[in-house]
Regions:
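A structural boundary/capping signal
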Residues: 1-162
């Protein structure tokens, strides 16, 4: 299992690749990133993690908040560590579209990696779904795996060295 520092290093590297990539040339990284991008980019990040550490188990966490649970978010957890690479979307979205709790936590960093007990994610969002990702993504469709593989290759190709 990777350490929290290893996760921080790889997540920073990966978020940088997403920030600088040509979003017109990727299927899963959309041009309004990080807004409305949490699940797709978290899936790509899980692909990256499983490429580096094929024996780990990753949990994809879906959280909701707001009136009728209309505000959603998605992040990863490895063991007891939360990894969020799209929290900064809540700095961009208009405050009147968000809950007081989200606005009070501003500004959000582009990357949030913290032990679960120290993270604000479980304070702000109620977990409504968890899914497990392991090497090979047996619960994901082949088409989506191919999209991840293709975009991952493009992302990794944008920078030759860490």
């Amino acid at each position: 299992v990777p350490t929290i520092n290893e996760l921080r290093i790889e997540t920073s590297y990966f978020r940088n690749l997403i920030d600088i990539c040509d979003k017109n040339n990727t299927t899963l990284v959309i041009d309004c990133f990080p807004v409305m991008s949490c699940k797709l980019t978290s899936m790509l990040l899980s692909y990256h993690f499983l490429t580096l550490w094929p024996d780990i188990e990753i949990t994809g966490v879906s959280g909701v908040t707001g009136k009728n649970d209309t505000i959603t978010h998605y992040w990863l957890e490895v063991s007891n560590i939360v990894i969020d690479i799209t929290g900064d979307q809540y700095n961009i979205i208009n405050a009147n579209e968000l809950t007081k709790s989200i606005v009070m936590h501003r500004p959000f960093q582009p990357i949030h990696i913290e032990y679960r007990d120290c993270s604000y994610l479980h304070e702000i969002f109620r977990v409504n779904e968890r899914e497990t990702f392991i090497k090979g993504f047996p619960t994901i469709t082949e088409t989506f795996i191919e999209s991840m593989k293709l975009d991952y290759t493009k992302l990794i190709g944008t920078v030759k060295y860490k």
